[in-house]
């Protein structure tokens, strides 16, 4: 989603490829996969981000996701 990052393309690709492999393993429908990814994002926000920053980060993530699907 992000075009500029402090992380290398290799780091991001490795994580994304691992996540795709897990999702494909379960052969679940797209809506279930999106629910699982949404739950994972929510969990990361609530367990790893200070409460004062959660809503702003969730909004930034949402905006980035929307922009990513608009350009494809």
From Swiss-Prot:
Pfam families noted in UniProt: DUF1414
Domain of life, per lineage: Bacteria
NCBIfam families: PRK13689.1 (NF010242)
Similarity comment: Belongs to the UPF0352 family.
Protein name: UPF0352 protein CGSHiGG_07710
Organism of provenance: Haemophilus influenzae (strain PittGG)
């Amino acid at each position: 989603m992000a075009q500029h990052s402090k992380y290398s393309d290799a780091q991001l690709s490795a994580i994304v490829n691992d996540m795709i492999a897990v999702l494909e393993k379960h052969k679940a429908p797209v809506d279930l996969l999106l629910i699982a990814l949404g739950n994972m994002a929510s969990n990361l926000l609530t367990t790893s981000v200070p409460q004062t920053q959660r809503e702003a980060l969730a909004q930034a993530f949402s905006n980035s996701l929307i922009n990513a699907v608009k350009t494809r």
